[in-house]
Amino acid sequence: MGMRPPSGLPSLSRRSRVLLVAAVVLAALLLLGPRFTDAYTNWLWFGEVGFREVFLTVVVTRIILFAAVALFVGATVWLALLLAYRTRPVFVPMAGPNDPIARYRTTVMSRLKTFGIGIPVLLGLLAGLVAQSNWVTVQLFLNGGDFGEQDPQFHLDVGFYAFDLPFYRMVLNWMFVAVVIAFFASLVTHYIFGGLRLSGREGTLTRPARIQLAVIAGLFVLLKAVAYWFDRYDLLSSSRKEPTFYGGSFTDINAVLPAKLILLAIAVICAVAFFAGVVLRDLRVPAMAAALLVLSSVLVGAVYPLVVEQFSVRPNAADKESEYIERNIAATRQAFGITSDKIEYKDYKGESDKNPLDVPVDAATIGNARLLDPNILSPTFTQLRQLKNFYGFPESLDIDRYNLDGNLQDYIVAARELSPAALTGNQTDWINKHTVYTHGNGFVAAPANRVNKPQSEDVAAGGSSDSGYPIFLVSDLFTPKDRQRIPVEQPRIYFGELISQSDPDYAIVGGAEGQAPREYDSDTAQYTYTGKGGVPIGNWFNRLAFAAKYAERNILFSSAIGDDSKIIFNRSPRERVQKVAPWLTTDGNAYPAVVDERIVWIVDAYTTLDNYPYAQKTSLEGAVEDSIDKKTGRLLPRKEVSYIRNSVKATVDAYDGTVTLYEVDSTDPVLKAWRGVFPGAVKPESEISPELRAHFRYPEDLFKVQREMLTKYHVDNPREFFTNNAFWSVPSDPTIEGGSFNQPPYYVLLGDPKTNRPVFNLTSAMVGYNRQFLSAYISVRSDPDDYGKFTILRLPTDTQTQGPQQTQNTMTTAPQVSQEKTLLSNSNKIRYGNLLTLPIADGGILYVEPFYNERNTGPNTATFPQLLRVLVSYRDQAGSVKVGYASTLAEALNQVLPGAGSLATPFGGDPATRPQPGTAPPVVDSTQPPADGGTPQPQTTPPPTGSAAKDAAAAELDRKIEAVRNAMRSGNFQDFGKALEELEAAVKTYQDAGR
């Protein structure tokens, strides 16, 4: 007896359909609206910075990749559904009136196009959305070339692994995805329409269903055979022997590699067996093939390599792995740029019987010993050169060098930026925050090897209030250009690290025609931006787009926005470089420099790979993290790399935001590939001006990665490498309390043994593996002539030279140091500066550490670090470790090396001219900015005696009164309170002097 087919799902009413459509449209607007807004504003921004071709190339590549994968996956699924539907049985027996399959079948039949086309389209769209993120893989495949280096196993060029293999893997993966989805789509369709029935003791499968499923399964196994072929190449990046070494090991090459070929052959045989299911009615052949494939994968692919590893390799690991460790050493050195042609190894005694006076090169090293720590002095810069409460400096300052008097001098440098976090009260109103307080003002520098004058010996007082401070050199709006020792044509700063911390990050500049200037410039003047940076928002469409982007209605309705207005956003130098060159990884630290009288930010950028054969893989985040990053919370790149090059250096103009990319490594194959993708985006090295090149530094993050690699890969002998007994370690920072963090590398000026002139180096001490004794000293040059040249001083293993942590303990426990520290700790915060390791005396090691104090005068009083003492440590030839401790480097040196203090640079003097050793330059009062905000002039301070003492006290009183007035004008209550306290002290001094 026939049965009435079950009814389908109830249809929706007209009102329900309208509401459903409205809900779908609203959801689409909510999901896609922000994306379209971002796309349009990015289009405008890339046009403003002149990199629209980059934007178009990326977008077009993503669209093509999206369309190709979506079409491929969607078409494959559609074809599978179509074949399954067309070959369905004509008559389908029903299990009963409540058969759930019949109900689903009726529903599908009633909406055949919805299911037959909608499902493939939806799956295709999802696949396309995922695939479009692989645009980098596609472009590198299309534009990649050769490295000129071959892998030691298959003798293929490294370019195959870097550019080709990832693309083949991507294509293979999407074929797997399409085949797997098609298989399950066919299976479900055949089940719904009766081609596959599971009723009874044994299920039944129609011939069309068997053929279709067998063919798809055979295709899957064929793809698996291809995957086994490519798996062979992936063995050269095996992590089986981590953490000992990276790359193919004995087991990988002698067991896993043959196993892959065996499995490939088995997979081909199994695929033939599945295809045989097309003509054979017996499914046992494909079933046996599937079982064979699984069993062989376990036995051949897993058990056999395990047996080889356990019973052949482990008992003889040093011998078995020796060849493969050699491969790993050679590849890692090549991939990380630490080959023998770039590194000069020198044996270094760690002790000497010479005096630095007898070694000509030491005059440059000691004379430029850095006493200012850029990671401590930000509060000092802020308090003494802030000018207004809304200006500020980054938490960690920078180091650069300038040649102002014919001698190279390193400076602590910073841009005086607008600090959004410092805005208070009505300054945070939208109109003020985004249209008035729009830019910073000036470039500030201080010579790194001296302060204005030494602290007094009165330790209990915590030092004097006008000594131990940097000697500032300022180029800003208030300093006439003829008085600027570092001339700056345009000191206004619209782009920087600090100003970009505004949330949201944008400023609106310009205004309606004839409108008065609005942007704050000084207490008596406003300014209107005239630079080429910024996106025009004079038209209503752009205003609407940015109002939607920032969810800010004021952008639409504010009268401060006129026809000539522009919006400046993406103001972080690193972010700007990362956006115009998304294929680069930027260094974590951009630094300001004055180049051709303009303030620019210099950003180091890297090309990287994660699949260089046999090269060690490391995490950038882990390799570059040190004590400074922990303090500042600097964002670190989170990616694994096995190849890195600093092939590009970028500049960002601080006024108009212009981004310029320069090639600095023409031999980098990865950069060559990207220049093929984005022709014209990177300027050739020949366009780098000598003025700009003079400010290039060897990048910190790259150095830290290479330093991490050199802890192991300085070893040549694979047996020593395997035992770890010759490894080094990065020392922990001994100046940090409350945790163990890597000591950061330090930029210092070291004497060049060939010329006896100072050379700007990035340096790091290295200690023995899991030990604290000094094992090596790494330095890399930043001067244009020998840029990137490493020198590694290797200390002997039969003597023990103290490392940074041991030296810190020795210095801080010295009787004089510990006694003064106890006296100071009651009313001062003690801060140790960077512990520098300096090679001197043709074999000796000198440690230099500045000792800062910061007064504890109350919770509402502004305090800031000042240099109080200088600590030095030196080990003589007899093995005795001597500690020097004084208010100047010269005095401290004389305590450990008699007479060597004459090589140290005296304190005080003109910030642009280095005083000659042994002279007494004029003392500079750095605590009071001049009336025009410029650079203070040196003032000679004679020793007060008799009536002169009263005159000096009176002059000091006048200065403190003027300081109170300046604090009142600035509106900074912290400065005002501090100025009042200092005025009271000056009054008492004057009264005492008159008695």
Swiss-Prot record:
Instruction: Give the CC-aspect GO terms.
Output: extracellular region; plasma membrane
Entry superkingdom: Bacteria
Its membrane topology, per UniProt?
Answer: Multi-pass membrane protein
Transmembrane stretches in the record are: 18-38, 63-83, 115-135, 176-196, 211-231, 260-280, 288-308
InterPro entries assigned to the protein according to its UniProt record, in alphabetical order: UPF0182
Q: Where is this region: Disordered?
A: 904-957
- Extent of Low complexity compositional bias: 927-938, 946-955
- Where in the cell is the protein located? Cell membrane
Alphabetical keyword list: Cell membrane, Membrane, Transmembrane, Transmembrane helix
Chief localization:
membrane
- Extract the Pfam families matched here: UPF0182 (PF03699)
HAMAP family referenced in this protein's UniProt entry, alphabetically: UPF0182
Homology family: Belongs to the UPF0182 family.
Q: What is this protein called?
A: UPF0182 protein NFA_45260
Q: From which organism does this entry originate?
A: Nocardia farcinica (strain IFM 10152)
